[in-house]
A protein has these predicted regions:
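N-terminal non-catalytic cap/leader segment that marks the start of a structured domain
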Residues: 1-83, 155, 176-179, 187
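Glycine-enriched loop-and-adjacent helix/strand subsegments that border the catalytic/binding cleft
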Residues: 61-62, 66-189
Length: 189
């Protein structure tokens, strides 16, 4: 199952994507992530031509720095023993084709394609062995960074959390359709 949010003349709507069609549903994507049953409206609209929004607007967005061995190597840093966490503000979130607006404090923006992991069940102090049981699904995210601010400051909130610095989507793919997320490839262009 792939869940999408898109704009209609009546406002935002959510739907299930099958092939190149969207089947609108009666609730929002966040409600589905939280366990609400999907009820289709019976309509069907083509994906092509839709103004696609962020699949959902999370209240908390946590990133992991240096999360790929290759990326750590290219920066000359070792893979951290503990995850290097950073936050992106809710206002950083935008749709997959939304504009990225650079703040005045940066002259050097950069981007990295990332796998967004959507947590569907409340979790705290979860073991590695049980972590995937809490995952609702996956999406593609563009982790935009103000590299000059990132190199200048010890914390990364300003560098990575600026408005529009987290375009993602176009949809969330349910975890049961991704049996081995570690084997996924991510490509940007």
């Amino acid at each position: 199952m792939r869940l999408i949010s898109y704009l209609t003349p009546d406002g935002p709507r959510a739907g299930v994507v099958e092939d190149d069609q969207v089947h609108p549903i009666t609730t929002g994507v966040m409600n589905v992530v939280c366990g609400e049953e999907i009820v289709r409206t019976g309509e069907c609209v083509p994906v092509a031509g839709l103004q696609i929004l962020s699949p959902l607007r999370p209240g908390k967005l946590i990133g992991i720095g240096l999360n790929f061995r290759d990326h750590a190597a290219e920066t000359g840093k070792p893979v951290p023993e503990l995850p290097l966490l950073f936050a992106k503000m809710p206002t950083a979130v935008t749709g997959p084709s939304g504009p990225v607006r650079l703040p005045a404090y940066t002259d050097k923006a950069d981007f990295e394609g990332e796998l967004a992991v959507v947590i569907g069940r409340e979790a705290r102090d979860v073991s590695s062995a049980d972590a995937l049981e809490h995952v609702f699904g996956y999406a593609v995210m563009n982790d935009v960074s103000a590299r000059d601010a990132q190199l200048r400051e010890p914390q990364w909130v300003r560098a990575k959390g600026a408005d529009t610095f987290a375009p993602w989507g176009p949809w969330i793919t349910a975890a049961d359709e991704v049996p081995t997320p570690q084997a996924l490839g991510i490509r940007t262009w």
